[in-house]
Swiss-Prot record:
One of its GO terms (molecular function) is imidazoleglycerol-phosphate dehydratase activity. PANTHER family: IMIDAZOLEGLYCEROL-PHOSPHATE DEHYDRATASE, IMIDAZOLEGLYCEROL-PHOSPHATE DEHYDRATASE HIS7. Pfam families: IGPD. InterPro entries: IGPD_sf, ImidazoleglycerolP_deHydtase, ImidazoleglycerP_deHydtase_CS, Ribosomal_Su5_D2-typ_SF. SUPFAM superfamilies: Ribosomal protein S5 domain 2-like. The keyword Lyase applies. One of its GO terms (cellular component) is cytoplasm. Its EC number is 4.2.1.19. This is Imidazoleglycerol-phosphate dehydratase.
Length: 202
């Protein structure tokens, strides 16, 4: 995977190319939700649009994958690329809030998402979707996308569905709540430019 940083350390562009996918992705943590998402998977593009808007990050994704097989590799590799980009954009984590959490209602759904951008991976996910498909999209890929993100962003991510029944609504709720938690965690802390750890390093 190749990448480059702009003059701002919180902007990263990278390319991930494998035998299954070819992904170009750029992220700006100090954005406004701008950018274009083109994964070849309509439902995933919709979720990425929500992520960019609610996290207030600029996000551009151009992906070509083996969609003739299924959506798995493309969704997974976009999660990997996005997590990697966020990790690199955060650098040593100095001056960020580090933690974020958000409980978000959407119609009959309620989801809590909590994030620690502390440089270590942990993932706990309890947001089951009863239906195996959301349209043509495998519903299990919602969880897999976020696990792939968390591994590569080197973060703790905990997602909990309190209640909800509609698969589309649950997915939206998960993406919006997690986006809002990420927004809080990566924001610059106006009270401190230090690394947010008593160890002095993350």
């Amino acid at each position: 995977m190749t990448s480059s940083n702009s003059n701002s350390s919180r902007e990263v562009s990278l390319e991930r190319k494998t035998g299954e996918t070819d992904i170009k992705l750029s992220v700006n943590l100090d954005g406004s939700g701008a950018g274009k998402r083109d994964s070849g998977i309509g439902f995933l593009d919709h979720m990425l649009d929500l992520l960019a808007k609610h996290a207030l990050i600029d996000l551009t994704v151009e992906a070509k994958g083996d969609l003739h097989v299924d959506d798995h590799h493309t969704a997974e590799d976009i999660g990997i690329a996005l997590g990697t980009a966020v990790d690199r954009a955060l650098g040593d984590r100095a001056g960020v809030r580090r933690y974020g959490h958000f409980t978000l209602p959407m119609d009959e759904c309620l989801v809590t998402s909590a994030v620690d951008m502390g440089g270590r991976y942990a993932f706990e996910y309890n947001a089951p979707i009863a239906a195996s498909k959301i349209g043509t999209f495998d519903s299990e890929l919602v969880e897999h996308f976020w696990q792939s993100f968390a591994v590569n962003a080197k973060c703790n991510l905990h997602v909990l569905l309190h209640h909800g029944s509609n698969g589309h609504h649950i997915s939206e709720c998960v993406f919006k709540a997690t986006a809002r938690a990420i927004r809080m965690a990566v924001e610059s802390d106006p009270r401190s430019d230090a690394i947010p750890s008593t160890k002095g390093v993350l």
